Amino acid sequence: MVPRLSAGTPPASPARWLAGRLAVVTGASQGIGAATAAAMAAAGAHVVLAARDQHALDEVAGRINDAGGQATPLPTDVSNEAAVQRLFAEVAGVGQVAALVCAAGVLTPARFAETTSAMWDETLRVNLTGTFLCCRAAFTAMVPAGEGRIVTIGSLSGVYATEKFPGLAAYNVSKYGVIGLTEAIAVEGKEHGISAICLSPGAVDTEMLRRANPALRPGLTPDDVADLIVALLDSRLAPASGANIPLFSNA
């Protein structure tokens, strides 16, 4: 059984664990990543923003810094191992990474029989391999500190026994993989004080989803997801480490 949370009922957050800590958010140029970076900065974290689009990344960082937060943009292709290594080397120059949120992702809808090898490879390379590369780098950096918190982004499309839709074969597989990866990180992170949790939202009103399915009416906003991520990071994650939390519609 997985716990079911709605966007309107985030867990209590009596203390700001994030305050004064260094965090990395991938996919931070738009959507869930951008909203999460802003929410984490508002909670007092110094947020390193990672994404491929430098212009969009600079805009997000500018808004956060103008609002009194602290954000450092570092353009990165999370599917490139060397780029991820450079990212975390630069992060180490800033300070000790305490939290990672993996929100980078792609969605290219295609019927199963029409899914090309290139579509398949790109989806898994960004959504799953990119998450693996960033989690591995962050995990390695967190071990000496004896603590760390990792949040990955799955999807209801990757949750067993939820309704599935046509055209999402590669995407669904990538998100099933992210959920399994998070469980593995939690198992090995326990002895190092590192917690990992996966948040699997339903349809979120993002540019990526609008491009993929303009007719879909999302029941969640990026801020809904971001607020829950911050609440989770500010709470004691250890007892729930390894869990996958489905996030259902706010409607």
Task: Label every PLM stretch briefly.
Residues 155:
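Residue(s) in the substrate-gating loop at a strand-loop-helix junction
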Residues 22, 29-30:
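Conserved glycine-rich cofactor-binding loop
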Residues 55, 75-86, 117:
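The beta1-alpha1 cofactor-binding region of Rossmann-like NAD(H)/NADP(H)-dependent oxidoreductases
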Residues 111-112, 119-124:
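Substrate-binding pocket helix/loop in short-chain dehydrogenase/reductase
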Residues 135, 171-174, 182:
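Active-site helix of classical SDR
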Residues 2, 191-194, 198-199, 214-251:
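C-terminal helical subdomain
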